[in-house]
Amino acid sequence: MKRFLVVTFLAVAMPLLAFGQAANKKSSSKAEEEIMKLEDQWVQSRATKDTTMAKDLLSDDYLGANVTGQAQTKQQYIDGITAGTIFAGKAEMTDRKVRIYGDTAVSTGFVTGVAGADKVRYIRVYVKRNNKWRQVASQGTRVEGGQ
């Protein structure tokens, strides 16, 4: 009887576990797509010095480190966009990866076309708050020789 109960339990539980993993994977890929889309919009808005996206996307407690190692708050970042010191013109992102950890996302890749640097490796951290992704931290490192 015990054996029958164990086999029955496993027969019922295994498909449920597999379904749960598939649903979680779908949720992660949807979140990855959301972050990729936000990052595309982010680059476009910075290229045109449009601060609307930064005001909406950056968390109020945002802290970033730019390619020169300076720490920047949300307001300092927005001021830099307006002044044209953070970003100027068209940029291209490559080797992009997004990893989802529940309500946190980590985005990495390269961006070319950043003012004062040929190529920058970046990492950005997002947290989902009130059903909306917010960038809470970022860091850019200049890659010598554009490699």
Identify the meaning behind each predicted range.
Residues 4-7, 21-147:
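A beta-strand edge to alpha-helix "cap/lid" segment located at domain peripheries
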Residues 7-16:
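Bacterial N-terminal signal peptides
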